[in-house]
């Protein structure tokens, strides 16, 4: 069985679940730079290592989710593996390890959650080219990010696309069981009195709510019938948004604090429409989760999961975050058309059934290990 060292920043729940699945096919060691992120709720963590070895490195935290120190480089230097993978290449500790690999001829892969096709400042672009072009392969999630990698001079033969996810096949089964009870049942359970419900999930701490486009949702709430509830699940709202709701009398806007996976499932099952109006998400796994519950999606064009998983007129709409009139039109169109929401939701479910941990693992086994037959 091949040995794999996987270097990442945090034990996020979806990563831990993937590692436990991937670890069935290799001798997997996961190196974590940190125990947690400065911007995440302390309850946001994985369940633990079952099929892999986990090591928390002694590194100094930098910013939200990066680290510095030589522990990662030293571990890589002292331990050989058939496959070496880095994820958080913008972290100083990971940069140091990659530079060592380049200088000493150690082969490595880089994996990405996603990303935008953007033009970097000159010096930053040079640094990225040095770090990334030394990799023997790049695993990424989206066509948009593939364009970016190619713009850095990465050969297309070294780029591999994989289905990024936070859901298992059991999650899909459980979602089916929940939604079979009907959305009205779950509206009552979570305390939503409105006839219909628009749901979004994300942190107000991201640019004070503007990063997730909550200002757009508040403007929409002002235009919508109060029988349509807008539910924002995440952390505590900022004072600005609390005051906005009070001053405009938006009683149909509901601010809900952090919810764990089990409680959040009730909100997905209660919703009629899911939206993510982010001003910058390199992926956005809540889109995957919402599609599991058969929800139509309205996503901004700055959420990579939306641009990758949502097809206009099939399972939702991708909208220009700066075009409020079109955004309003799409919301009013979908929330008022029951048949279209059902059709779009069914298409969402079919699409996301291709994005499970099993399929993500099979992709990695094929790309990194040469397929199951070579294990």
Predicted regions and their residues:
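Short alpha-helical donor nucleotide-sugar binding micro-motif in glycosyltransferases
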Residues: 258-259, 266-271
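Aromatic "clamp/platform" in nucleotide-sugar-dependent glycosyltransferases that forms part
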Residues: 279
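Short hydrophobic beta-strand element within catalytic cores of glycosyltransferases
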Residues: 296-300
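Nucleotide-activated donor-binding/catalytic signature segment of Leloir-type glycosyltransferases, i.e.
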Residues: 241-262
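A short, histidine- and acid-enriched strand-loop-helix "catalytic/donor-clamping" loop
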Residues: 92, 106-124, 134-137, 141, ...
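Conserved acidic donor-binding segment of nucleotide-sugar-dependent glycosyltransferases
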Residues: 311-313, 317-324, 332-339
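Donor nucleotide-sugar binding/catalytic pocket of nucleotide-sugar-dependent glycosyltransferases
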Residues: 133-185, 192
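Conserved donor-binding/catalytic core segment of Leloir-type glycosyltransferases
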Residues: 5, 181, 192-212, 218-221
């Amino acid at each position: 069985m091949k040995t794999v060292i996987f270097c990442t920043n945090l034990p996020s729940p979806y990563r831990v679940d993937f590692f436990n699945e991937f670890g069935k096919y290799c001798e997997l060691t996961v190196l974590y730079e940190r125990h947690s992120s400065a911007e995440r709720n302390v309850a946001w963590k994985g369940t633990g290592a079952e099929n892999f070895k986990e090591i928390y490195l002694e590194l100094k935290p930098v910013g939200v989710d990066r680290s510095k120190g030589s522990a990662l480089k030293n571990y890589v230097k002292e331990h050989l593996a058939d496959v070496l993978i880095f994820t958080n290449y913008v972290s100083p500790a990971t940069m140091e390890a990659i530079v060592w690999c380049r200088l000493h001829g150690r082969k490595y892969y880089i994996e990405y959650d996603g990303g935008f096709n953007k033009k970097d400042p000159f010096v930053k672009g040079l640094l990225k080219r040095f770090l990334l072009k030394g990799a023997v392969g790049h695993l990424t999630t989206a066509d948009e990010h593939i364009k970016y990698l190619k713009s850095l001079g990465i050969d297309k033969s070294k780029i591999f696309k994989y289905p990024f996810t936070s859901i298992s096949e059991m999650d899909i089964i459980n979602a089916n069981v929940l939604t079979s009870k009907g959305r009205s049942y779950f509206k009552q359970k979570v305390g939503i009195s409105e006839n219909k419900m628009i749901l979004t999930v994300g942190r107000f701490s991201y640019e004070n709510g503007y990063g997730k486009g909550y200002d757009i949702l508040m403007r929409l709430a002002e235009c919508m019938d109060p029988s349509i509830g807008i539910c924002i699940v995440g952390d505590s709202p900022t004072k600005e948004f609390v005051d906005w709701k009070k001053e405009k009398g938006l009683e149909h806007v509901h601010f809900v604090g952090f919810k764990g996976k089990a409680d959040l499932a009730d909100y997905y099952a209660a919703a009629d429409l899911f939206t993510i109006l982010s001003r910058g998400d390199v992926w956005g796994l809540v889109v995957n989760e919402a599609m599991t519950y058969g929800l139509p999606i309205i996503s901004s064009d700055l959420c990579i999961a939306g641009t990758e998983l949502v097809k206009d007129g099939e399972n939702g709409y991708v909208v220009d975050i700066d075009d409020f009139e079109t955004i309003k039109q799409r919301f009013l169109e979908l929330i008022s058309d029951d048949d279209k929401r059902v059709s779009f939701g069914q298409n969402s479910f079919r699409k996301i059934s291709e994005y499970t941990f099993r399929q993500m693992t099979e992709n990695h086994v094929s790309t990194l290990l040469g397929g199951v037959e070579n294990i």
